């Protein structure tokens, strides 16, 4: 399968601090990939490397191009919304559509207007009068109207309420994902986007601790729900993570639980949140409370 991103040994340092530490991964076409990590894990830095804003050591091809050296050519087929994306407050959506038509040869003004019809944003509204959720939907409509092959989103729903986040992701899936184009989304709101993803990349302190299609999670990891009587036996098996669930406790293992534990509990499907907590070395939590 064709890869839209190929990275080998990506490394970036700021002075004595290693921000990206030898990352190896690829993103095939037609995928929705979650780039997950806590604040400071290196997500934004990696995205800036992918779009050519920063130079890293190692080998990197995005859409077959070298991002730093061929950035102008790359941005013809790549759309990017950074975490600090700002639209001019004085402008209207109609003015931004006109501006984009002159700047981006692959931009379709007709498609942008069509996408905005599914939102509550009017073409003649001033940006300064729009809510955060409306601005996010406008921004997505503008980039989704570009005939690009790869969409890179850095914390696109940060600061939005639940309804606005839901509307944003529904629009993303409906209007962008077509089996050929790919999306890379960075977030620490793991539970919220799990159902949207086909693949996941997990960063922890600049290291890639997991790169996996979601369909492979059940083959590599397992969870065991158990009661208090089995707690000591489960702990002795050194699970990746122990956590509380409604009605008892659970433990996450790489591979299958030891055979001697099978009769002590119930097999559970590990969630992406559980893996995230286990692989980014977070302490025990009550899963009912979320992250």
Task: Give residue ranges: language-model regions.
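Conserved structural motif at the start of ABC-family nucleotide-binding domains
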Residues: 5, 20-22, 75
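Walker A (P-loop) phosphate-binding loop of ABC-type ATPase nucleotide-binding domains
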Residues: 37-42
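Helix-to-loop junction immediately C-terminal to a conserved catalytic motif
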Residues: 51
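Conserved ABC transporter NBD signature motif
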Residues: 58-69, 73-74
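ABC-family P-loop ATPase nucleotide-binding domains
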Residues: 82-139
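Catalytic Walker B motif of ABC-type/P-loop ATPase nucleotide-binding domains
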Residues: 151-155, 160
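ABC transporter nucleotide-binding domain
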Residues: 167-253
